Amino acid sequence: INNALKQGCRIFYTTPLKALSNQKFYDFCEQYGADKVGLLTGDTSINRGAQIVIMTTEVFRNMLYGTNFGAVADNLKDVRYVVLDEVHYMNDEQRGTVWEESIIYCPTNIQIIALSATVANCDELTNWINTVHSKTKLVNTDFRPVPLRFFYFDSSQPYKLLPLLTPDGKLNNKIKPEKPQWARGKDKRKKTYVKQIIQNLADNDMLPAIYFTFSRK
């Protein structure tokens, strides 16, 4: 984005979700100034001629539908970069073709920056983009803006959260396997500690949080 602004050209930033596009729009307006940022979704059009335009990937793909293969239409004039955020959506059964077509039909003079934190076959994807679009380089990083920290909830009283790993990356030896909570002929449902876990999170200033469970029961 900074390169586009310095070069005086335009950049499209695509996302798979309207909500994510809206969030990026507000973030970029705050960072770069509202006069430099536009938004295009299915039902919203704001400053569409801006240097930085955020849109859903479907909107970008539909722009390409109206041009000859490899050509640059008026709506792509001065566009030098296209960011495809969450490019792993290419594996989605219903919507994956949107990302494929966006890459295939994108003019080769436009540089594609494909972003994802979850693509497993990144080398294969790089080679494919290199074949159907233009020369492509894979850039890997293990940097996380928000570092992951793992904890284990000790259900023996007093209830507490224990670091899963030691500072050198080894399993915390204070964590012991839980004993089975049921015996033959008794209720086999495992006791849950939702309230105790949330209380521990609150006590350690770790809220808000998302509590994920595999069952509604």
Tell me what each language-model feature is.
Residues 26-30, 67-71, 96-100, 127-130, ...:
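Short, glycine/charged-enriched secondary-structure capping and boundary segments
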Residues 9-11, 36, 49-53, 78-81, ...:
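Loop/turn-to-beta-strand initiation segments
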Residues 1-9, 27-29, 100-106:
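Walker A/P-loop NTP-binding motif
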Residues 9-65, 127-130, 137:
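Conserved nucleic-acid-binding Ia/Ib motif block in the N-terminal RecA-like helicase ATPase lobe
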Residues 17, 55-59, 86, 116-119, ...:
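A short beta-strand-to-loop transition that corresponds to the Sensor-1 phosphate-sensing loop
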Residues 53, 57-61, 68-114:
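SF2 helicase catalytic motif II
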Residues 27, 59, 98-101, 193-197:
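Well-ordered alpha-helical segments embedded in enzymatic catalytic cores
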Residues 104, 111-113, 118-217:
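Conserved interdomain linker/interface between the two RecA-like ATPase lobes of SF2 helicase motors
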